[in-house]
Amino acid sequence: MKVKICGITDMETAKRACEYGADALGFVFAESKRKITPGLAKEIIQELPANVLKIGVFVNESVEVIQKITENCGLTHVQLHGDEDNHQIRRLNIPSIKALGVTSEIDMKNAQAYKTDYILFDSPKERFHGGNGKKFSWELLAHMSKELREKTILAGGLNALNIEEAIRTVRPYMVDVSSGVETEGKKDVEKIKQFIIKAKECSK
């Protein structure tokens, strides 16, 4: 099971997450309590292992700005949490992830229209897009096609206590956590370690 730790804001957390086995790290460039500057993101990314995906999170940002930040920071993928359509996705010409809030099985069917490398299924949007720490009904994704499952990233209220059930129900390609590995709003490296251990155990 692949694991993404999202909302990275400092070098120490990034390095420890990689040591514990994270397959991807997320850097939020949209409005969020976990927002990071491109300059700091670049510093961190330059120190990370080559095999770890470096994913930039954007919400309704212009194609030009996304491309510039991607190139300057050394991102491998972009994660789109806004109203981006296939036209914008094609213009980006960058490996991409489309994030969708899930309220019914219709959302799963709509996801298949997006021409992205991955689809991230999350809890419905609130003030901030993603990272709200709220789970949705995983059963809504239990019967997706094999093709969609192989490009599914599951997010939304995941933590070390519920990750086994989430993986067993959805069987995604990757799981994504942010607030579920925090203590008082800050990344907690021990929680990151336990989350990664639990998630990896599920795929043995």
UniProtKB/Swiss-Prot annotation:
Top-tier EC class: isomerase
InterPro entries hit by this protein: Aldolase_TIM, PRAI_dom, RibuloseP-bd_barrel, TrpF_fam
Keywords for this protein: Amino-acid biosynthesis, Aromatic amino acid biosynthesis, Isomerase, Tryptophan biosynthesis
Catalytic activity: N-(5-phospho-beta-D-ribosyl)anthranilate = 1-(2-carboxyphenylamino)-1-deoxy-D-ribulose 5-phosphate
Pathway recorded for this protein: Amino-acid biosynthesis; L-tryptophan biosynthesis; L-tryptophan from chorismate: step 3/5
GO molecular function, one term: phosphoribosylanthranilate isomerase activity
SUPFAM superfamilies xref list: Ribulose-phoshate binding barrel
GO biological process: L-tryptophan biosynthetic process
EC code: 5.3.1.24
Domain of life: Bacteria
Keyword Isomerase attached: yes
Signal peptide boundaries: none
Alphabetized CDD domains for the sequence: PRAI
Family label: Belongs to the TrpF family.
Protein name, per record: N-(5'-phosphoribosyl)anthranilate isomerase
Species of origin: Bacillus cereus (strain Q1)
